[in-house]
Amino acid sequence: MTGRTHMAVGAAVAVAAGLAAARLADPSAASASLASVGDASLSPAAFLSLAAAGAAGGLLPDTDVSTSEASQELGRAWAALVALIALSLALYTAGVTPAGQDPFVALRWLASQLGPNHLAGAMTLVAVCAVGRASGHRGFSHSLVALVATYAALRLALPALAVPLALGYASHLALDLLNKTPLRLLWPLRRGVCLGLLRSAGMADGLVLGLALLALLCSFARGVLGIVLPWPPGLPTWS
């Protein structure tokens, strides 16, 4: 599957899980029919957070190759951070910063918000990505061990977004299982597994992408705007 398909499916899965959790948390909504309840259950900010986290999780496994979209995006983020630090140092050493103003004020504030758990989680996540890169494409980073390790790291680093990120990660593994190229899902076992049903960047890839985007649109209309969507007659409802 292409990177954009992994992002769309990861976002759709994370938003669907968020809607289900919000529905179960509301007794009145949980006891009503899926076809009749149209009240909004997610704020726009929550929807965007879930979608972004799911999309990011959907790209994480492909950080094991330098040509992947995820790896390129991470490289840009690291480059931006290095550029920011370099600019701060340049301003400090050149004396351009006004007297009494700390050129590292933004970085110091960010560091003050980070506790030991956040740092430990971030370091664990970096280690998972490093092992994945060392093991090659569709190796460690495409395994159940990596999924569990990533979730554990995210629980420390970003507890509020750990579940949608992990769901996006899991959706990536599920999609890649449908591909014709094996992945080492049961790492450290060397044998790869695949179902061989789909081809990356083929017609099926475009179909999956379209369905994921449609699911996101429907989730936004129903979960955020509270629009009751037409329900085909004869289909079962959740009650």
Describe every region a protein language model picked out:
Residues M1-S239:
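N-terminal membrane-targeting hydrophobic helices
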